[in-house]
């Protein structure tokens, strides 16, 4: 009898020795699928599961009840491009170069040469090496080409996503007729300045203080500049509003009509054709970023105008994706995650005065700021086979934590040649740890370190210190309504020395800054965080910004074009 057992035992050992380790993963419990969803500019106060009583989000609320709700989930940056770079790489944007310079803090043109460097590793690229089918549906906003149109070095296909259907830039006001332009500050300020100069010039000429030739020359220059700016606004939709399938342009400019339904169907189709393999699907919604749009089925469905209608449509899409997992029998072993790239954009107001930004609930300020309203975002995680339903976790977590979490669960290896700032969430989600994976989180405004968050071990306190804060306008508001977003340059901020200190566990609205007279440990807390800053800065290797003027400005030879210049690059290859 013993000889009968030895043969299969030896055969099993022989198989282990002969087969590639990556080919025998099926001998272990199956690895989970991943469905990761990121809504654009969604405020934490827009969802029923986070306290909203007037918007209907039943599918998202159901997702929250079936898994874990993270109540202290932090975006690594308060703006689209840097936040998404950090999410994909698990690294602060200062490390990858995806940080702003001057008054520009996101990528603005498809024809720029900046983007997420190919040297960066995304969780998708590691999952792909582990045998996962990978796809990105929706918004990218991390660059496209480098040297020419045949060099898509920043394209999602080059950074781990085998399949891509979406927009390489972002949903701009310019992409939807009648919604104005995202370049309003960059263009209207020069126009207003020119108008003041012209009026002053004519007054001086009227009183004989300037010669006529000077007035004629300045007027001609103003006319040329005005014509150039008008032409620029005319071509922006053709330059920037592009829909792609992998490397091919399918619409230029894209139509928002039923676009969410189309992208939802793309997500469903991908899951259906990948159901027999492990897969990673990232759905980056174009909504609820402006220009706001929604299909006819949802128009007028909310009491919050077009913004609320768009939230309803996103919730419907989430429901379709979750129902597909149920239908395919994949819900149990699929990690589902939903978040926003940053807080709601409070300064978004339409030309008619309708509010086009969402709600950040009790949290101060919004998008473009490192106050809680700008970076505290929804964080919902469901893994039905492993995580019990109805949990709430109040410890600080970061959207950077998805990188090491995906790597761990896909049985990949974290890179050893770079700093990874994210921390795996597995132990916290499974109840095997009760502590935040982060003792410190660092909050940048472009390249400037603005704030630090400290979660001491064995304490419920969460301290947050600000070294400078934006100058809000109007003064008593919580936004920068004169510039549409808050900037980081010295002229737009107030420096604090000593720093502002808040205890977020007692003051989540950041309304009561503490000092030595109100916090006995003030000096100890400030010095502890100062030392953390010194240690953190020592780990930063200088890297040029991918948003420098040279990389940011559009270059004709990089402009994607699916027809010809004489046709304004227009095409519609799919209906």
PLM regions with names:
Residues 55, 147-159, 291-294, 299-310, ...:
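Histidine-centered active-site microenvironments of extracellular/periplasmic hydrolases
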Residues 8-20, 183-236:
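Transmembrane alpha-helices
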Residues 49-51, 69-91, 99-100, 136-149, ...:
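Short, solvent-exposed turn/loop segments enriched in Gly/Ser/Thr/Pro and often Arg
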Residues 176-179, 229-250, 267-309, 345, ...:
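Active-site His/acidic residue clusters
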Residues 36-37, 44-135, 144-148, 156, ...:
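Active-site segment of extracytoplasmic enzymes that catalyze sulfate/phosphate-ester chemistry
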Residues 157, 162-163, 167-190, 344-370, ...:
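C-terminal cap/loop subdomain of S1 sulfatases and analogous C-terminal strand-loop tails that border
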Residues 23-71, 133, 140, 242, ...:
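Active-site-proximal N-terminal segment of extracellular/periplasmic enzymes that hydrolyze or transfer
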Residues 12-14, 24-32, 39, 44, ...:
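Long, internal low-complexity/basic segments
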């Amino acid at each position: 009898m013993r000889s009968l057992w030895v043969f299969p035992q030896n055969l099993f050992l022989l198989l282990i020795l002969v087969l590639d380790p990556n080919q025998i993963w099926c001998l272990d419990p199956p690895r989970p699928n991943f469905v990761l969803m990121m809504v654009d500019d969604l405020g934490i106060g827009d969802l029923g599961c986070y306290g909203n009583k007037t918007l209907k989000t039943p599918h998202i609320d159901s997702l929250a009840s079936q898994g874990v709700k993270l109540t202290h989930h932090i975006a690594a940056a308060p703006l689209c491009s840097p936040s998404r770079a950090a999410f994909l790489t698990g690294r602060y944007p200062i490390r990858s170069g995806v940080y702003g310079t001057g008054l520009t803090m996101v990528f603005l043109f498809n024809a720029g040469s900046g983007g997420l460097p190919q040297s960066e590793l995304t969780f998708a690229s590691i999952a792909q090496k582990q045998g996962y089918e990978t796809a990105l549906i929706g918004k990218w906003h991390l660059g496209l080409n480098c040297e020419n149109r045949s060099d898509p070095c920043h394209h999602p296909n080059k950074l781990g996503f085998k399949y891509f259907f979406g927009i390489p830039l972002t949903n701009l006001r310019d992409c939807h007729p009648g919604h104005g332009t995202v370049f309003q500050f960059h263009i209207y300020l020069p126009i207003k300045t020119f108008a003041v100069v012209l009026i002053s010039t004519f007054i001086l000429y009227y009183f004989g203080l300037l010669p006529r030739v000077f007035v004629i020359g300045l007027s001609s220059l103003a006319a040329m500049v005005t014509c150039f700016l008008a032409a620029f606004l005319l071509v922006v939709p053709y330059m920037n509003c592009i829909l792609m399938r992998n490397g091919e342009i399918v619409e230029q400019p894209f139509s928002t009509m039923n676009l969410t339904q189309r992208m939802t169907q793309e997500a469903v189709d991908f899951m259906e054709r990948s159901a027999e393999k492990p897969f990673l699907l990232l759905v980056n919604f174009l909504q609820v970023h402006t220009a706001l749009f929604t299909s006819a089925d949802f128009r007028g469905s909310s009491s919050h105008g077009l913004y609320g209608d768009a939230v309803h449509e996103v919730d419907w899409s989430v429901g379709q994706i979750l129902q597909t997992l149920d239908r395919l029998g994949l819900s149990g072993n699929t990690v589902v995650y939903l978040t926003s790239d940053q807080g709601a954009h409070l300064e978004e107001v339409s030309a008619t005065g309708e509010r086009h930004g969402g709600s950040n609930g009790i949290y101060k300020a919004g998008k473009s700021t490192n106050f809680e309203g700008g970076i505290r975002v929804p964080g919902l995680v469901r893994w039905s086979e492993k995580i019990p339903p109805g949990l709430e976790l109040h410890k600080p977590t970061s959207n950077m934590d998805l990188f090491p979490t995906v790597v761990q669960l896909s049985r990949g290896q974290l890179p050893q040649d770079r700093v990874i700032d994210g921390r795996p969430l597995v132990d916290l989600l499974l109840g095997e740890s009760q502590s935040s994976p982060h003792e410190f989180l660092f909050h940048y405004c472009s390249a400037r370190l603005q704030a630090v968050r400290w979660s001491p071990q064995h304490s419920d306190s969460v301290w947050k210190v600000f070294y400078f804060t934006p100058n809000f306008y109007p003064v008593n508001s919580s936004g920068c309504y004169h510039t549409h977003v808050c900037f980081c340059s010295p002229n737009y901020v107030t420096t604090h020395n000593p720093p502002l200190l808040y205890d977020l566990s007692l003051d989540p609205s950041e309304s009561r800054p503490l000092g030595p007279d109100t916090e006995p440990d003030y000096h100890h807390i400030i010095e502890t965080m100062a030392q953390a800053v010194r240690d953190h800065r020592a780990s930063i290797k200088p890297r040029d910004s991918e948003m420098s003027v040279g990389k940011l400005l559009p270059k004709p030879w990089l402009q994607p074009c699916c027809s010809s210049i004489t046709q304004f690059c227009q095409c519609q290859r799919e209906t």
